[in-house]
């Protein structure tokens, strides 16, 4: 786990983006950046945001060699042929496209079912909120995993694959959504007959993802799957 300036590097790449329910926001660079943007848009916080940094907080200037390297990269980018044809993006196999299609179908039907129902979207204990939060994210992460795998097939590397990380996020969303639908049945908010198509989608998606991405479950997400390292980080900050 890499930490820079108190932030866990890459933690937001494989999270569920449900910041209101996350215990890692104080160590997330993306959360801090979004909070800063929102503060800039709030006139009540303008004076704080615009205040100059303290001398000890000001970052040191980049070394000369780094500035020269950046200048060279910018020059190369400007000199590149603007009309150069980009390689055609490879399409996933038909079987993988079927997973995308099923995720799309689940999203569409879950969205239609949720419409008109009142619930707090920020309450992670509310099964309605859980289904609402993950029905789109499952679709998005399935899409990312499937298309990332196409690009990774020709790469021989021991580095953890983005496709596995994205598939893991989708699988986590599937697991939580499955439990939420069953919770609604227990509460009497939906009948067994009504919930059956949604459960069938989730079971099919989960089994398909685990077949195509057998290493997804064991993918280690920065911070989120490293409790010992996070505990050490918190202890160091408190000490």
State where each predicted segment sits.
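Conserved binding-pocket/active-site segment within a compact domain
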Residues: 124-204
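Short, solvent-exposed segments of well-ordered alpha helices
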Residues: 6-9, 13-16, 60, 97, ...
């Amino acid at each position: 786990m890499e930490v820079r300036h108190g932030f866990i590097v890459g933690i937001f790449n494989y999270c569920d983006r449900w910041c209101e329910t996350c215990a890692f926001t104080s160590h997330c660079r993306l959360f801090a950046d979004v909070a800063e943007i929102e503060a800039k848009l709030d006139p009540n916080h303008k004076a704080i945001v615009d205040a100059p940094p303290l001398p000890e907080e000001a970052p040191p200037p980049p070394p000369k060699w780094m500035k020269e390297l950046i200048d060279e990269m910018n020059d190369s980018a400007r000199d590149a042929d603007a009309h150069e044809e980009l390689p055609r993006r490879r399409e996933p196999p038909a079987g993988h496209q079927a997973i995308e299609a099923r995720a799309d179908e689940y999203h569409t039907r879950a969205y239609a079912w949720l419409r008109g129902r009142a619930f707090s979207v920020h309450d992670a204990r509310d099964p309605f909120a859980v289904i609402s939060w993950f029905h789109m994210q499952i679709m998005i992460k399935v899409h990312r995993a499937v298309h990332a795998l196409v690009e990774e097939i020709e790469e021989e590397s021991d580095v953890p694959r983005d496709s596995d990380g994205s598939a893991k996020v989708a699988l986590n969303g599937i697991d939580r959504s499955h439990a939420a639908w069953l919770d609604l049945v227990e509460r009497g908010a939906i009948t067994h007959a009504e919930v059956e198509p949604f459960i069938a989608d989730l079971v099919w998606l989960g089994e398909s993802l685990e077949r195509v991405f057998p290493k997804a479950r064991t993918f280690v997400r920065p911070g989120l799957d490293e409790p010992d390292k996070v505990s050490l980080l918190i202890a160091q900050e408190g000490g």
